[in-house]
Amino acid sequence: MKFGTKVQNYFQFIILNSQFLCTFAAMICKRHLLFVLILLNCLLAMGENAAERTKRDFQRLGLSFYECHDVRILPTGEIKFRDLFQTVEQARKYILMDYFKFQQDSICGALLDILRRKAREGVKVYILFDSFGNHDSDYPLSDTLQASIRRSGVEIAAFDPLRFPWINHLMHRDHHKIAVIDGEVVYTGGMNVADYYLHGKPKVGKWRDMHIRMSGSIVTAYEELFWKMWRKPPSNSPLKGENQRSATEGKANSLPLREGWGGSVAFASRWPRETPRIMRQTYQAAIDNAEHLVQIVNPYAMIFGEVRASLRRALERGVKVQFMVSTKSDGMANDDVIGLEMRKLMKRGAEVWYYNDGFHHSKVMMIDSQFCTVGTTNLDARSLCFDYEVNAFIFDPATTTALQQVFDDDVANHCTLLTPEVFRQRFPLRRRIRARIFTLAKRFM
């Protein structure tokens, strides 16, 4: 192989001056070590995809990663409760349930019948529900029913009971939806325990939601979260079950990053005074790392702050952003404020789809067909700034693709694309004025 004269001269210069060049490079590195490290970090990041960069960002945020052997998507209430009931029937050691609402209706009654029977069989059963969520329910658990449940051997407690005049307790509520069985399986997502997930509500029609079931070491994280909530002062009385905590409690909160069949899972738990910004930070990191596609389904998309800024940056980078919200929700103010936010996204280039087949209560996001999140977090002030929330960020293309298929099927069969004409039809002037008034209180909704 022959080189040109200029190339040969370059090689000769480098060989003759190699000692000087090495000394000069060492001086540069010594004086500008921080710059060199930043440059190397940027060069490494250029070779990573969105999932790898997001994992790195999550580790900096202090999130723990867990192994997941299996992820099952439960896209409807009927599928979720059938699967949950079957797993509860097979419980041998303990059952832990933490839900924002246990509505006193047919589906709750059927579940309680199974739990009472399992308690008689010697299985330890613990139920935690949010006190405010119970008062806000159409059919709250009565004191009489709770006493009956305790007599059957099931431990049941209300999280942070409301006591007048301490209304500050209204702000930090237990919004979890968690069921752990024998430390082997966890269910989580957007569904409470109520029969409207099967039969709908008169105001909105069908009530659509989504849950997931996971196994593997990720279950440990949810189990530890349950006991942390159970023990939180003011104490839930009586807590006779506190000495019956499972063997998994007390294990290290962070396990090595390992890839299971379902991929690694990052565990994000919002604790008002410990990790108040974690949901905003994780959503921001995920969206900021997206290269091609962001898909979000969320019922209360009153987006602001970090999440709104991240979506705008994604659109400016040329990332395709698809957002799905419901035509009808369970609050007039919610509909109006969400409408204004969706219009802003639409004007910046996002695809906004209005779901027409009832109320879509799911809380999911998919990034670049590489990873996704499913959990309890709404994109409103209550979830992002006040309540106790938990999300699983699942780094698995197969699970993400399956969620995308559900999204795409809904778009094809149950959705209307938001356009300027559609917005004007849905939001006449009077409603837009009302929405702007409601927006003033958005940070408390």
PLM regions with names:
Residues G4, C29-R31:
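Short, basic/polar N-terminal leader/transit segment immediately after the initiator methionine
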Residues G4-Q8, Q19:
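Cationic, amphipathic, low-complexity segments that mediate targeting or membrane/lipid association
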Residues I28, L43-M445:
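Charged, low-complexity intrinsically disordered terminal segments
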Residues H32-L40:
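Sec-dependent N-terminal signal peptides
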